[in-house]
UniProtKB/Swiss-Prot annotation:
InterPro entries: Ribosomal_bS6, Ribosomal_bS6_sf, Ribosomal_S6_plastid/chlpt, Transl_elong_EF1B/ribsomal_bS6. Pfam families: Ribosomal_S6. Keywords: Ribonucleoprotein, Ribosomal protein, RNA-binding, rRNA-binding. One of its GO terms (biological process) is translation. This is Small ribosomal subunit protein bS6. GO terms for molecular function: small ribosomal subunit rRNA binding; structural constituent of ribosome. Belongs to the bacterial ribosomal protein bS6 family.
Length: 109
């Protein structure tokens, strides 16, 4: 099965509890459509370069998903219907990045 990198931005007004609920809901949806969540990362509440739907910040999250193309089409369709998700990007990748991603690394400025 192919592996997909799925990054999404959730509304800034979500509490940590609501964000966890959103992530668990997306994970449950993956199981329901026959996909597997391989890895999940929360990157934090980050500023936007411009306002999106009256939000100046957003909760950035990354998921690595193993799924058939038809299942990913259904997943993307259902995520579009979720009002808490402002934007998302889904890319097909060859493998899952091992360890922490660059966004999870520490600031050494």
């Amino acid at each position: 099965m192919p592996i997909y990198e799925f990054a999404f931005i959730a509304q800034q007004g979500l509490t940590q509890y609501e964000l966890e609920g959103l992530s668990k809901g997306l994970s449950a949806l993956l199981v329901k459509i026959g996909a597997e969540l391989v890895k999940y990362e929360y990157w934090g509440l980050l500023d936007f370069a411009y306002s999106i739907a009256k939000n100046n910040k957003g909760h950035y999250c990354m998921m690595y998903i193993r799924a058939e193309p038809a299942a990913m089409d259904e997943f993307r369709r259902r995520v579009r219907l979720n009002e808490d998700v402002l934007r998302f990007l889904c890319l097909k990748v060859d493998k899952v990045c091992e360890g922490k991603s660059a966004m999870m690394g520490s600031d050494q400025d």
